[in-house]
């Protein structure tokens, strides 16, 4: 449960960061 809450916003940040690097 706690992991999902942390992964929620983290996933978005990771996608945005990866998209900006490409």
From Swiss-Prot:
GO terms for biological process: sensory perception of smell. Coiled coil: none annotated. Keywords: Olfaction, Sensory transduction, Transport. The N-terminus is blocked. It comes from the Eukaryota. Binds the chemical odorant, 2-isobutyl-3-methoxypyrazine. Homodimer. Belongs to the calycin superfamily. Lipocalin family. This is Odorant-binding protein 1. It comes from Oryctolagus cuniculus.
